[in-house]
């Protein structure tokens, strides 16, 4: 199974790149984790935000591999504690399909992305900066993997 993070935004601060890449490189060869960045639409004073959101959504869905399970990162999604995420990761592995996790831009996810999702995961009821979400998702998935393999990274 391959994990894919599809995220709006291409110019992340160095701390995001460093944190995300640290976890990305920790994933084992049998569970590769990749990042697909979608350019954010230009948001000016007179921007058509609805159209920008639609375009970002179209690009996100086009980046998802055929047959992939789509999981959105969204505040109203299901909150998973770490052991629950580990169980979820195991179910995804048993399903045999690749998993694409979608992080929207400043206005969130396009309705088309939400409609295409099989699951929606809430990291927190708080509104989080999208760059931070990349790092949180990578760390959370790595921690979940460590639980499923009895790797010493996670401690109770």
Swiss-Prot record:
Molecular function GO labels: rRNA (pseudouridine-N3-)-methyltransferase activity
Catalytic function, reaction form: pseudouridine(1915) in 23S rRNA + S-adenosyl-L-methionine = N(3)-methylpseudouridine(1915) in 23S rRNA + S-adenosyl-L-homocysteine + H(+)
Organismal lineage: Bacteria, Pseudomonadati, Pseudomonadota, Gammaproteobacteria, Enterobacterales
Top-level taxon in the UniProt lineage: Bacteria
Pfam families: SPOUT_MTase
Name of this protein: Ribosomal RNA large subunit methyltransferase H
One of the record's GO cellular component terms: cytoplasm
Residues annotated for S-adenosyl-L-methionine binding in this entry: 73, 104, 123-128
Cell location: Cytoplasm
CDD domains: RlmH-like
Keywords associated with the record: Cytoplasm, Methyltransferase, rRNA processing, S-adenosyl-L-methionine, Transferase
Physiological role: Specifically methylates the pseudouridine at position 1915 (m3Psi1915) in 23S rRNA.
Protein family per UniProt: Belongs to the RNA methyltransferase RlmH family.
Encoding gene, per UniProt annotation: rlmH
Native source species: Serratia proteamaculans (strain 568)
HAMAP family the record matches: 23SrRNA_methyltr_H
Known partners and oligomeric status: Homodimer.
Enzyme Commission number(s) of this protein: 2.1.1.177
């Amino acid at each position: 199974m391959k994990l894919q993070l599809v995220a709006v935004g291409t110019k992340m601060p160095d701390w995001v790149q460093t944190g995300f890449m640290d976890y990305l490189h920790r994933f084992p060869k049998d569970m590769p984790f990749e990042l697909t960045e979608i350019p954010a639409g230009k948001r000016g004073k007179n921007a058509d935000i609805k159209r920008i959101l639609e375009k970002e959504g179209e690009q996100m869905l086009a980046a998802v591999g055929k047959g992939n399970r789509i999981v959105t990162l969204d505040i109203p999604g299901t909150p998973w504690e770490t052991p629950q995420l580990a169980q979820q990761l195991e179910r995804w592995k048993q399903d045999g399909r690749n998993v694409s996790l979608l992080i929207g831009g400043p206005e969130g996810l396009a309705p088309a992305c939400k409609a295409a999702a099989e699951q929606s995961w809430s990291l927190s009821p708080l509104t989080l900066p999208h760059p931070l979400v990349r790092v949180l998702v990578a760390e959370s998935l790595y921690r979940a993997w460590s639980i499923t393999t009895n790797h010493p990274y996670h401690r109770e």
